[in-house]
Amino acid sequence: QTSRRSGVRAARRSARSAPLPDHLKPVRAGMEGGTFSPLNKFGMDRIHQAVLDALETIGLSQAPQTGVDYLTAAGAKLGDDGRIRFPRALVEDTIARANRSVTLLGRDPRHDMELSGTRVHYGTAGAAVHLVEADGRQYRDSTLQDIHDAARIADVLDNLHFLQRPMVARDIADNLQMDLNTIYSCCAGTTEHVGVSFTEPEFVRHGLEMLHLIAGGQDAWRQRPFVSNSNCFVVPPMKFATESCQVMEAWIAGGMPVLLLSAGQAGATAPAPIAGAIVQATAECLAGLIYVNAISPGHPAVFGTWPFVCLLYTSDAADDLLCVDLGGRRII
């Protein structure tokens, strides 16, 4: 009888520790999101019109010459002041024809993420340069091993559906080696979709060579690109980041999806009123969307408005804010 009870207890423990089947998991990739609507239709229309005004009358400066060529060929206007301005018709046409059914792929197809509709996915993000040790609570520089460990953790957590490079490999001084080893450590740790940044446009061809090897060839990579480029292509307010734009162009040519990031701070690099910060971030990301579609119509691009608030008494960024799309469809 004692042996039987022990066997029952062991079976219960085994059942409790076993992974849940997909249909019982409380958080699943692509669950339909809720609705948060801080603005009514009139308010959203005002912001939309302000975005169009900003793109048409202010525009963005410091595009690389290749970007100027792509954008002016698509219908943007280069002013005598060097700023690229975007006619309303060009903006609205791009919105209408942009790819709205983007799927970010994992190396394992079960990790594919369809981004259409109100589907929500959670993952890591950021580029932390320090780590707090669990033992001793001491800060230290983050390392390549930390990135790999984070990828391994994300790979087995049900509520993390993709891996954005969460840390910087501070133990690698050479930027090319850092970029290549970051890709390798992320892909070695997870089969989920991976997001990475690159330092120089000249490094992209080396990154593509590695990705082709991991994928099993160039054709296999282009059929299932499992890494995207997290690209801060603007320096707010309303300036293109020249080298980041060149990196973006190179990755697009290599078949990589792009996450367009605008990270202005309300009260510092964006207007202090939240509505103004939203206008600027939306205008900047729309300029990026036009840029991407001017290079490759329909190329997969994620609209990554990322507005922060500057704490004026410390000049720090309050980065614990929600990013909400203007249609009230999903919270990230």
Locations of the language-model features?
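Conserved small/polar residues in nucleotide/adenosyl-binding loops
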Residues: Y313-D320
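Acidic/polar, glycine-rich intrinsically disordered N-terminal extensions of enzymes
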Residues: Q1-Q145
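Acidic, glycine-rich loop-and-beta core segments that form the ion-binding/anion-interacting portion
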Residues: V247-M248, I252-M256, S262-F308
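Hydrophobic alpha-helical segments, chiefly the membrane-spanning helices
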Residues: D325-I332
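A glycine-rich phosphate-binding loop feature that marks nucleotide/adenosyl-phosphate handling sites
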Residues: V68-A73, F303-L311
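An N-terminal assembly and electron-transfer interface module characteristic of large anaerobic redox
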Residues: Q1-V8, T282, L289, Y313
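Flexible, glycine/charged-enriched surface loops at secondary-structure junctions
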Residues: S61-D69, D80-G82, H161, A220-R224, ...
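Catalytic alpha/beta active-site cores
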Residues: R83-P271, A275
